[in-house]
Structures are given as structure tokens and as C-alpha cells.
Amino acid sequence: MPSIVLPPKPTALQKPHINLAVVGHVDNGKSTLVGRLLYETGYVDEKAFKEIEEMAKKMGKEDFAFAWILDRFKEERERGVTIEATHVGFETQKLFITIIDLPGHRDFVKNMIVGASQADAALFVISARPGEFETAIGPQGQGREHLFLIRTLGIQQLVVAVNKMDAVNYDQKRYEQVKAEVSKLLKLLGYDPSKIHFVPVSAIKGDNVRTKSPNTPWYQGPTLLEVLDTFQPPPRPTDKPLRMPIQDVFSITGAGTVVVGRVETGVLKVGDKVVIVPPAKVGDVRSIETHHMKLEQAQPGDNVGVNVRGINKEDVKRGDVLGKVDNIPTVAEEIVARIVVLWHPTAIGPGYAPVMHIHTATVPVQIVELVSKLDPRTGQAVEQKPQFIKQGDVAIVKIKPLKPVVAEKFSDFPPLGRFALRDMGRTIAAGQILEVKPAQVQIK
């Protein structure tokens, strides 16, 4: 049985690569739109999709067929049918676009902040249907939360898909109303709405996704795929020291220890002498693989499996970081960070102990000091040593990890310098590290 989502075609691997986050409130059509994009770009197995369509028809749920592409893919992944295909992707004329952390995941907010694949751009999906739209950008709406989040992450490239236009009879007035409301929110967050494309689409019917729709003669702009095609791939920092957070560790018979992760900065070559910290274990790189292809070297953005000689599986875990012996990743004794409080029922003071999610690591921490409270618009300090901070506040804080963890300054290594704080099953804050006080590391 072929996988429902096809692997990258040879043409795709020659194109510049972008990681796209698909964000928006539940039930606004994210999964359907992703399914539609994959289908329109030829990345869905026809035979497998026909089965899904027939099943949806039988159950009287024809509208679900495109969303079910992702459900089927997730099932395959959980059953281990497609181990390396944790991401799905599609091609535009100029780019190969990977969709990171498929929508609907319960840890989506956390994964957005510290996902192994950091987003270079975002597709914001908002429903035009009355009620759904108002909920999504209301005070408790995930749509609103996700927009705050992509702003906090510094994602500049954004497209807004105003979805479910078929449900409002392709009404231009409703589209303009949604556009005006979302623009207001974007402006508040410091985006320039005039530079952001809004596209009226129907994920179910396919309007304005790949081809211009006759149902929206009033819309003269580009299709969704045309907008995505204008996104710029970020510079990949090959000149920085090597940092590769570890997502997984395997012991493979006859090969030894294989660590899996994404190279965030620097270059990893076969034969390199590497160190994995916090455990401070040293080894040699025997081979590097991606998508079942052997590589001589891996660069930023590459998701790879690395066969390391001299390190045992028991010594390494998810959340450790691989670097080179001549530039060891920093294990943090204490960090100073700027945080945005996204959600908290009361207030946060010194002594508060949430869990920090940083790159692929999860570690208990304690906020030991509130240094200052900032004006969110200017970044200037408005209060020194506040007694507490609450939802919506931006502050500089000192944080002490209660277990060893690698953390770097955001300005040096962005993917290892941004984090989420979680508590009570929710994301409490998103932050960027300004200073790191390093712990002593003895190489073994």
C-alpha cells in the first residue's frame, strides 16, 4: 500500500526549501487546506485518495475527504509505515515547501515555538463563516493566539487564507470584513497589513488555491500557490559552529548508535570528531543519511540520521545537542531571557517553576528573578524588579534550569535560544535568551 502522501520528487530536492507553519483556530479548515495544497501539487497518491473519497461519500461526509489525507498520513506514521516522513511537503514553481508539525496536534503551540523544524513562513487560515471567524480571533481564540505566536517567533513572511468562501456564497462584503478585522490585529502586532497577501479560498472546492476562481470575479490578486511561491528561503548559517539538537537515538544492529536530528547551524561531515552535551560524550561520525540517501556532509535545515562511533545509546537522549569538540554547545547554569506571557490564570512571581521546552529538550526550571517589565511596543523597560507579571506582559527574567540543558543566546543560535514555558497543560510564555551563564562541562 503506497503512502497517501508522496515523498519529495527529484525536482523538489533541487529547489530552495522553506518550512511553512499552518496556523489558525480549530475547525477553520487548516487540514482540509493542507490536503488540498498537496493534492493540487501532485503530492497525493491518486489510488489511496480515491479510497478515501469513496469512504467519505458512503458516510455522507464528502467535505472531509481532503482533511482525511492528513489523518491517513498520521495513522501511517503512528503505525511506523513511514518513519522518516514526519513532514509532508509540496512544490511550487520555485520552491519546495515543507509543512511542519501538522495542524491539530495538541502540543501545536509548544511545537510552533520549539519545533525541530523552525518555521520560515506562516499560512494563517481563517474561516469566513459567521461565528467561526468571531470565535477564532476573539480573546480566547486560537487564531489570535497563533498570530501572537508567529509574531513572537519573528516570522515575517505571512499569507492569510480567508477560507470557506463557499459557505458565505463568495460574498465580497464578508471577505472585506474578515480582512479588515484580521488587518487590525496584525497592525496591533506590528505587521504592515498592506504588505500581507489575503486570498479568498475554499479548501473544499479548490477556489483560488491553484487556479483563479470564477466565483470571485471581484478578487484580482494572486492564487494561494502563487503567493507561497513568492516567499524567500532564509539564509542557512553554515559559517556558525555546529549545533544539532537530538530528536531520537537508535541502536542499529551492525551499525551502532544512530542519532537523529536537524542541523540548525554549521556543517557536519563524515569523519568529524563530535561531542554530545550535557552528557559530554565524544565520538566520530561514521556516516550521515537523509531520506535513505547517504551524504558526505549535512547543512543547516537537513534532517539527518548520524551514525556515531564511540557513543552508546544509553548515554544519549532526546534534547541533548551534538556539536564539535572545538566548539562545545553551552550547558546553561542560568539564563536571562525576554519572555511574553501568553496565558496565565493569575500572576507569575519569583519562585514560579514551569517546564521549559527548548529545541528538542524538556526540562524543569525556576524563575529566580523578575528583572524588569517592558513596554511591548517599544521594548523599553517601564518597571524595574516588578513583584509579579501577568498575561500579556513582556518581561526580562532570570531562569535557572533544574536539570542540565543546552541553551544558547538567541542572537548567536536562534533555534537554541528560543523556548516555551508550559504549565497546567498550556503554553504559559514564549521567550528568547539574551544571556547564558555557562555551567562547567568535563569531556569524557
From Swiss-Prot:
UniProt superkingdom: Archaea
Region feature (G1): 24-31
Location of the protein in the cell: Cytoplasm
Reactions catalysed, as given in the entry: GTP + H2O = GDP + phosphate + H(+)
Family matches, as InterPro entries: EFTu-like_2, EFTU-type, G_TR_CS, GTP-eEF1A_C, P-loop_NTPase, T_Tr_GTP-bd_dom, TRAFAC_GTPase_members, Transl_B-barrel_sf
Pfam families per record: GTP-eEF1A_C, GTP_EFTU, GTP_EFTU_D2, GTP_EFTU_D4
EC number: 3.6.5.3
Gene3D superfamilies xrefs: P-loop containing nucleotide triphosphate hydrolases (3.40.50.300), Translation factors (2.40.30.10)
EC supergroup of this enzyme: hydrolase
All residue ranges annotated as the tr-type G domain in the record: 15-236
Binding positions for Mg(2+) per the UniProt entry: S31
GO molecular function, one term: GTPase activity
Keywords assigned: Cytoplasm, Elongation factor, GTP-binding, Hydrolase, Magnesium, Metal-binding, Nucleotide-binding, Protein biosynthesis
UniProt binding sites for GTP: 24-31, 101-105, 163-166
PROSITE patterns xref list: G_TR_1 (PS00301), G_TR_2 (PS51722)
Chain spans, region G2: 80-84
Family membership noted in the UniProt record: Belongs to the TRAFAC class translation factor GTPase superfamily. Classic translation factor GTPase family. EF-Tu/EF-1A subfamily.
Protein name: Elongation factor 1-alpha
Source species: Pyrobaculum calidifontis (strain DSM 21063 / JCM 11548 / VA1)
Lineage, opening ranks: Archaea, Thermoproteota, Thermoprotei, Thermoproteales, Thermoproteaceae
